[in-house]
């Protein structure tokens, strides 16, 4: 049974579906990033991945709050969680740079998709108060791309993860002690 209020406009329903899709994408991402983090032995790589995971968690929670403001409870889809774990298993064990290279294909389409949500539903985005979370969603994907490219270019771990760390609103994981 749908919990959608009959007074929602078509634009709001489209926005709701887009936000639900983005939320489930973060459910996938949290599962994947956590599993990859658990698999890493190098302390700097593990720290970087923990930072990436924290951003995923924050965005998942922010999207859940945005959905709640729209009157909908975000329920993590077990299929998305399982798919995130399966994706992690596919890349766990790959050499570091090869694993990072895998993400260079997946992230740019997400920037386009999340940017399009705000444009396609412009009239509803501000009304329901979700522009900030959509903007942050785009910035997080862009920061992830910057991280992957910086790592592939050989930048220092503390520098390459900088754009991601800058997005964290909660506590920043402690970097490894050398």
State the predicted function of each range.
Residues 2-178:
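Non-heme di-metal
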């Amino acid at each position: 049974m749908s919990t959608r209020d009959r007074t929602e406009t078509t634009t709001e329903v489209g926005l709701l579906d887009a936000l639900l899709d983005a939320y489930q994408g973060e459910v996938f991402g949290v599962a994947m990033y956590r599993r990859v983090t658990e698999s890493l032995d190098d302390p700097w790589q593990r720290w970087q991945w923990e930072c990436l995971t924290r951003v995923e968690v924050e965005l998942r929670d922010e999207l859940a709050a945005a959905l709640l403001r729209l009157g909908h409870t975000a329920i993590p889809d077990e299929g998305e969680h399982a798919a995130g774990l399966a994706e992690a298993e596919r890349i766990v064990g790959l050499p570091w740079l090869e694993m990072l290279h895998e993400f260079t294909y997946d992230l740019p389409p997400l920037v386009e998709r999340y940017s399009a949500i705000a444009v396609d539903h412009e009239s509803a985005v501000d009304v329901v108060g979700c522009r900030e979370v959509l903007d942050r969603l785009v910035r997080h994907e862009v920061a992830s791309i910057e991280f992957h490219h910086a790592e592939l270019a050989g930048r220092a771990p503390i520098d390459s993860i900088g754009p991601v760390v800058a997005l964290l609103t909660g506590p920043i994981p402690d970097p490894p002690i050398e």
